[in-house]
Amino acid sequence: MECSEKPVFHNYTVRELALLRITPPDEAVRKLVKKHWDTLAKPLDGMGSFETITAQIGAILGTEVIDIRKKGVLLFCADNGIVEEGVTQSGQEVTLAVAKSMARKGSSVCRMAQSIGAETIPVDIGINSEESIPGVWNCKVCSGTRNFLKEPAMTEEETVRAIATGTRLVRECKEKGYGILATGEMGIGNTTTSSAVTAALLQCGAEEVTGRGAGLTDQGLARKQQVVRTALETYDLWHADAFAVLQTVGGLDIAGLTGMCIGGALWHVPIVLDGVISMAAALVAERLFPGVREYLIPSHLGKEPAAVKLADALQLSPVIHAGMALGEGTGAVMMFTLLDMAMSIYGQSATFSEIEVEQYRR
């Protein structure tokens, strides 16, 4: 499928993009959802974080009658020029191979999503190949980013176009009836780009946020950390704004995910975040548009060292602590299942009045 329509921000400059404003979720609805939870025949706050999260989802959707049965996972696939520096175990050909697997519904996230009735939507936003892949949405901005040790990863125009693509896809999904979306990605080298983005935005050292990715050796990890450190120093990224950081050391997948987070806030669609790649994009989005985080649902806390720092910076509390590092959106899809379970209680459980028991009071 082609991304034929011009993105929402297609002709915007960075300054014009910055003029957009995010409206907050509906606080009145949030209170109604919380009030309904208290009427259910269970201990007060018995579902813990899930009561807060469902109230957030209701506030985002603007209704206490919450319907998130139609779920989608946007999988942004892109290559990263920084792989030239030996920061990964595999080459860019793997991005294309996994994207094809996603199109056939064969990858990990696709199998998980299919098991719960969620739809996976692979998106070519920057694979380093001119091959057209049946089953993958062709939204290519360019054929991968540049090696950011030699030059900025993207141009300003490419960065805006990638953000715009993510935002527009959220709108299209909402128009097609999706009630909730999850972030997913595939791109060899994207734990390097996300580490660089995270270190710059949180003003911390490369070694604090750069992990082994798909399983680097000690030597490989040291090389990866040095690459991130060099980029931070070369471009003085600790003093750069979020857009400049994204453009300089980010990836097209991260930019697309950034747009997806922004789109969730603009179109009032709850966005379930996956791991560090998604959370790095979410932090960029929040820095560009304060308030975006109110539209984001955390899923899991992975084993990459940046995970805790990103969650803290976003003031989000992931509920799954399983040491996962698979990527693709797998943690977010797991969260879909937990949300469905919580919603089965919220929408169907007996109330105190129905079982003729006095309601607990706060």
Task: Identify the residue ranges that each predicted region occupies.
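N-terminal loops that bind phosphate or other acidic moieties
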Residues: 1-362
